[in-house]
Amino acid sequence: KPRFEDWNLIKAQALITGKVNYVDDKLRVEFRLWDVLAAKEMMALAFTTVPNNWRRVGHIISDKVYERLTGEKGYFDTRIIYVSEEGPKTQRIKKLAIMDQDGANNKFLTLGNELVLTPRFNPASQMVTYLSYFKNMPRVYLLDIETGTQEVVGDFPGMTFAPRFSPDGKKIIMSFAKDGKSDIYTMDLENRIVEKITNHPSIDT
């Protein structure tokens, strides 16, 4: 047990203790969260993982501690999907890329052969939908982050805007131009049925 009286001297409210052991080529990480004022344990967890996953375990522990102390979900074990740009002004190369929220583990997901725009995660943060132009024709793609597998959801006429997932992750919502005006459509990812959900003379995006 920690010496709570020492931590009270500096008015600490919470304290984390932990240890890391190397067992059978794996890391075992244990930690405890303590309430200093009440002098009692608030949480105790242990994780076993391969050594190169140590950063991920650190992020998971940070999320657990953050949620226990604040009541809100942590964001440490999250990733950012973005469009990377490089090259001269007249020949910009855009690639789909992903990194941890703290900037580590940056990885390119596309080669830069085509223009890519507006990447969006699904609710589980395992799939990404994005817009790309193939021979100047807009296409909506689905990409599995873990396997690298991607598929074309559909080719759409005219201008296409910002595909994204529905809150349940079962549909893609997008805007594209048809018959001279833009409306918002949904596509069911299971049966690929497209349904128009707006019908206004003005532009809907």
Feature names for model-found ranges:
Residues V29, T78, K94-L96, P138-V140, ...:
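Repetitive beta-architecture junctions, highlighting loop-to-beta-strand starts
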Residues G74-F76, P123-A124, P167-D168:
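Residue-level detector of Asp-centered blade-edge/turn motifs that repeat once per structural unit
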Residues I80, V128-T129, G169-I173:
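Hydrophobic beta-strand positions that form the internal "hydrophobic ladder"
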